[in-house]
Amino acid sequence: MSMQSHHVHLVSDATGETVSNVVRACLAQFEDVRVVQHRWWLLRSPSQVGRVIEGIQRDPGTVVFTVVDPEIRRALEEACRLINIPCVALLDPVMDALALVLETKGNQQPGRQYTLDEGYFSRIEAMHFALALDDGQSLDRLKQAEVVVVGVSRTSKTPTCMFLANKGIRAANVPLVPGIDPPAELMDLAGPLVVGLTRDPKSLSDMRRSRLRLMREDGDSPYAEEDSVAREVREARRLYARMGWTVIDVTRKSIEEVAATIMQKLGTAPWGEGL
């Protein structure tokens, strides 16, 4: 018996990133359901609402929107009311609470979070930095980093640094290679936060085997052999302990969770701020 499809319409006056992320987080809590998402972005005039409503009528389902323009909102909500479709204003509870506390109304301007402000250019600079100092490159610039991520192969060093860079944090990463001493630039480093990533040896071995298969190489090489991997992990952890570096086990953590932990250590994302 085939699973019934449920339709959800995501409507935004900007890129749709906010409503997409929130709905994705909510849907993750529901198992064994099939949801078809319909995306309607850059809704900037009441005349565009008709096209959206036509799509909703074709595939009826809950509407979740982030639209700030009052006229467009009214047109969308009224159209949904007439066809008896639930219509959820995603940001209203937060905006109302903030307006009450701040004793002022927010600017009703779509996409304000995407303006080319200082934060935007800081993120671009951080992305260039992370790319330039990826995988042990440009070690002479290591002291310019805010955080240096260290780990054996396949411990998510690069994606973690790229995620941090997207938050405007200058992040570099240095690989630990069996049989090769860590670079002096890393060992003599003073100033930046150094974070050592580790992973369960069995999980790490499985990941490396998968990588080798994708590359059509021998999956039984020492690179992926579990005992060899376990030795690598032990040696890395000994190094972390000797150097007093922060250690994060990434075995059951997403990239976002690892980055959030690092940001907490940096002090750039205390409780009440964040990703």
Swiss-Prot record:
The keyword Kinase applies. ADP binds at G151, V152, S153, R154, T155, S156, K157, T158. It catalyses: N(tele)-phospho-L-histidyl/L-threonyl-[pyruvate, phosphate dikinase] + ADP = N(tele)-phospho-L-histidyl/O-phospho-L-threonyl-[pyruvate, phosphate dikinase] + AMP + H(+); N(tele)-phospho-L-histidyl/O-phospho-L-threonyl-[pyruvate, phosphate dikinase] + phosphate + H(+) = N(tele)-phospho-L-histidyl/L-threonyl-[pyruvate, phosphate dikinase] + diphosphate. GO terms for molecular function: ADP binding; ATP binding; phosphotransferase activity, phosphate group as acceptor; protein serine/threonine kinase activity. Its EC number is 2.7.11.32, 2.7.4.27. It is an enzyme of class 2 (transferase). Coiled coil: none annotated. Keywords: Kinase, Nucleotide-binding, Serine/threonine-protein kinase, Transferase. It comes from the Bacteria. InterPro entries: Kinase-pyrophosphorylase, PPDK_reg. Bifunctional serine/threonine kinase and phosphorylase involved in the regulation of the pyruvate, phosphate dikinase (PPDK) by catalyzing its phosphorylation/dephosphorylation. NCBIfam families: PRK05339.1 (NF003742). Belongs to the pyruvate, phosphate/water dikinase regulatory protein family. PDRP subfamily. HAMAP family: PDRP. This is Putative pyruvate, phosphate dikinase regulatory protein. It comes from Rhodospirillum rubrum (strain ATCC 11170 / ATH 1.1.1 / DSM 467 / LMG 4362 / NCIMB 8255 / S1).
